[in-house]
Amino acid sequence: MPTIIVTTRDGEELSLEADTGLSLMEVIRDGGADELLALCGGCCSCATCHVKVDPAFLAALPPMSEDESDLLDSSDHRDATSRLSCQITVDDGLAGLRVAIAPED
C-alpha cells in the first residue's frame, strides 16, 4: 500500500495510504481533501481534479491523453507538472508520490 503525500491549497500536508488500483483522485478525496472537487466523478470531463505532480515522479506516470491535455488547457494554472488526478492509477511504483492540489480556476 503506497503512501501518497498531498499538499492542500492552504499548505497542509496529508500523508495518505493508497490502495493500488484506485485513481489518485479517489485516494485524495477519500483521504479528506474536500477541496479536490472532481465534479465529473473521474470521467475526464471537468478538470476539477487538477494537481501539480512533483517533477521527480512525472516519468513514472502514464502518458497524458489528448482529452486530458485539452481539459488542462482550460486552466489558468496549467504548467509542465499539471495532471488530472482522475487519470492516474495508483500502483506500487508511485510510493512516495508528492502532489499539490492546483489553485481553483
From Swiss-Prot:
CDD domains: fer2
Keyword Iron among record annotations: yes
Superkingdom per UniProt: Bacteria
GO MF term set: 2 iron, 2 sulfur cluster binding; electron transfer activity; metal ion binding
Residues bound to [2Fe-2S] cluster: C40, C46, C49, C86
Domain 2Fe-2S ferredoxin-type, chain residue ranges per copy: 2-105
Coiled coil: none
Sorted UniProt keywords: 2Fe-2S, Electron transport, Iron, Iron-sulfur, Metal-binding, Transport
UniProt family annotation: Belongs to the adrenodoxin/putidaredoxin family.
Function per UniProt: Component of the chloroacetanilide N-alkylformylase multicomponent enzyme system involved in the degradation of chloroacetanilide herbicides (N-alkoxyalkyl-N-chloroacetyl-substituted aniline derivatives). In vitro, functions as an intermediate electron transfer protein.
PANTHER family, sorted: FERREDOXIN-2, MITOCHONDRIAL, FERREDOXIN/ADRENODOXIN
Protein name: Chloroacetanilide N-alkylformylase 1, ferredoxin component
